């Protein structure tokens, strides 16, 4: 299920108002694999606890542009490590997360599928919601 920005804000504000929410974000729309952990402060403003990015510039340089199949393979190879680094750097544990967010578009479909599948797996294993961004 895809949520609009307003629906996401309402879900966070109305349904989960009891604590400072911690969300793991996953990005894989093109040629960078990224994971970030954010937590809202007392004024409900998101604070970035970690932001880890792995670029694929060198992978695609010789082709003069992004090759979707190579980009997707690189995401598959790196997404676990990037996510673990983001969690470690943030100082939180997976059990502390309140939701998982992953890029749903726009982007290269094969790349988006990697991040969404990974996000869905993490969310499912922790019994959390997956927010499509």
Range-by-range predicted roles:
Residues 39, 120, 124:
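Short, well-ordered alpha-helices that flank and scaffold nucleotide-derived cofactor binding pockets
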Residues 131-133:
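Conserved small/polar residues in nucleotide/adenosyl-binding loops
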